Amino acid sequence: MHKVSIPQSVIDDVVASRGREHVFENLDPARTALIVVDMQNGFLMRGVAHALCEEAIEIVPNVNRLAHAVRRSGGTVVWIQNAATPESLQSWSVRDEMDGPERSARRTASMAPGTKGYELWAGLGVKSDDLFVQKTRFSAFIQGASNLEAVLRSRGIDTVIIAGTVTNVCCESTARDAMMRNFKTIMVTDANAAETDALHNASLIAFYLKFGDIMPTDMVIGCLNANAATARDTAAE
């Protein structure tokens, strides 16, 4: 598990600009979605992964706890699967130019729909009534990457909780673009994973300063449970 380290100076800057440390702690579960990014064998399974992130295996219990809490409180769980499709290989050719032919070939073999690498990691607590969205860019919200935004809008979602791998690429890209599309956005500090602590923390810090909130799993679950209980009490009156 990553050692999360957010400098006090960063927290002070956030409080100075927003008035408090956490601006999205008052979660409305019914309007909240957990977005789990790229927790696939192509990133987690040795011998299959084209870009192995061993830290991602460590966050699986927290991802499952979050998914359970979101469902129980009345929210939505969405599993994002990265895909290398013929269309995306053509329309996003600059990615392959940057990676080079050998790495590009490994990624294509690992991330093609129908392959072992494309499948979600077996240890995830996936339920049949969860939602599944395929994306073809780092960000799930950028134009042409997926239908995630339309799916969320159709359900009245205005808040997204970001978990998954890797923190500083697909998770941060998705989180930043979620905020730019006017979703309240939270990155979960101990339910995202990168290759190193340094990359993980740098990503969280950059996001926290300008794009949204960051919270540990326990805090997110506490916020969900508190408002779910309030909603039940109100309905019973």
PLM region descriptions:
Residues 167-174:
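Short glycine/serine/threonine-rich phosphate/pyrophosphate-binding segments
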Residues 212-222:
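Short acidic-hydrophobic, aromatic-tinged amphipathic segments that line or gate anion-handling sites
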Residues 196-208:
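Active-site-proximal loop->helix
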Residues 159-164, 184-197:
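A short glycine-rich beta-strand->turn/loop micro-motif centered on a GG-aromatic cluster
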Residues 113-159:
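Internal catalytic-core helix/loop-beta-alpha segment
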Residues 1-127, 131, 223-237:
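Active-site acidic carboxylates
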Residues 72-75, 156, 182:
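Glycine-centered short loops/turns at secondary-structure junctions
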